[in-house]
Amino acid sequence: MARGARRAPDCGVREVYSLRREWRLGAWLAPALGFFCGCEPSVPESVPAPLRASDVAQPAGWADELAMPSTPDLNPDPNVLEIELEARVADVELLPGLKTPAWTYNGTVPGPMLKAKIGDRVIVHFKNSLPEPTTIHWHGLRVPNDMDGAPGITQTPIESGGSFRYEYTLTDAGTYWYHPHLDSSTQVGRGLYGAFVVEDPADTKTFGDELVLLLSDMGLDEDGQLLPADTGGSFGDLFGREGGTVLVNGKVHPTLKVRNGKQQRWRIINATRARYYNLRLRNHRFVRLGGDNGLAARSEDVYNLIVTPGERADAVFTPADAPGTHNVLRWVPTERGYGSTFNRSAEEMLYIDTVADAPVTPEPIPAELRTIERLDVTNATQRTLELTIAIASSVEMGVNGVPYWKTKPIETTLGATEVWRIVNNTDFSHPFHLHGYFFQVQDAARVLEWKDTVNVPTKSELTLAVRFDDRPGAWMYHCHILDHAEAGMMGTLLVRDPASAAADLPAPMHNH
């Protein structure tokens, strides 16, 4: 099997380094409008040709390992995870033999994988050595309000050369990740992200060999250099920017060695700005265990895993290929609006080599995984949030027709249960993310689970139930296509504690 893969072009939107992200009608939108008219999109001559893995020399027997970077725990207490994180520019090898000046945590892409358990106290001594301000958002973790990393909402941006101490106690098992929340599309696109796994010591279930797969992409030229933010020009711009180089744990086409019959539990994280992953493995099915916030109520058999930006999936597969056989994990373009599958084909991501037979018979995966009580919404407050896009001289996105910098916060009370109807009448799908709280999708056809990020397909709606049980304060909600959020598709939720003095909501910043 040839180990070169066809790659999608790097998609770009004009980058404006200001508090408000402007999406102007220019070269980037013209190809999109051409597509609507039935014309084939053209790419400006100044746009570098997308780099293909086959263009890079690969040594004989080349196979990257999937080991994630780590960082020392500075605290001897087994119930405390204390680390140092530094955001800095560093040369990293993302493509064989080439150095990329990426934006990194502790000098690696991805950043160090963090692992702890429910009840642990986490202390992060963070230093910002980037040339611009930043923060860290602990995506999915239910942390105290002032630890959430939302600039201008929960904390002041950390200036270049500055530092901040993040400290919180872990309350929920699951697969999480961390990333910036200031100029986030650019900073994430340059390499700032890392995985965070929280385990439940009381959960004795095992599902074979466990592996975290952090999926990302970056825009790189033929020399491994980061492409400028505004070198796009394909129809993909309105879907958000996708880097043309797809990475698994910071590697291009790594190889995983497995044993026939030995179960593999994959914790999958979509750390991209905009790319939807529809994952398939030839002649195999997955058993989905859950996703964002730990195990679902029950397992389900699926033949593909769709993981949208910011979302996570927890799944098991049992290798069934004979020793000496090679398989490939592919992502398949998935329909998420006009032209989302136009001129795109399946791409190889991860090579899987079966090297031996497992000595044991795979354990059956239970149908029932854990008990989850469905939220009682009998007296819940009902809200409707419509995700909107307006195109005139610029592209302005918002919620209920209002961009973030013009919107007023939603206000609720600590202890309240609410039902949110998320309406998407736009021509593009949007992954909806809520900070600070978990929700349940109100759909009898879905497996019951706790989530913080969910896809709202184009021309559809979803109903979510959420209980604001603790941690009062101001929290964000937004589309997790990061360019969409920065174009205005986000809002603020203010959870007030009746027992405390009313807090003033900070004025919203325009670039997150």
What does each of the following model-derived ranges do?
Residues 109-116, 122-125, 138-172, 248, ...:
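Extracytoplasmic beta-sandwich strand-turn segments characteristic of Greek-key/jelly-roll folds
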Residues 43, 162, 166-203:
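Hydrophobic or amphipathic alpha-helical targeting/insertion segments
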Residues 126-130, 268-272, 422-426:
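Asparagine-centered strand-capping/turn motif at beta-strand->loop junctions
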Residues 73-102:
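Mature N-terminal segment immediately following signal peptide/propeptide cleavage
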Residues 35-38:
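C-terminal motif of bacterial Sec signal peptides marking the signal peptidase cleavage site
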Residues 41-84, 188-220, 297-429, 467-474, ...:
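Extended terminal and domain-junction accessory segments
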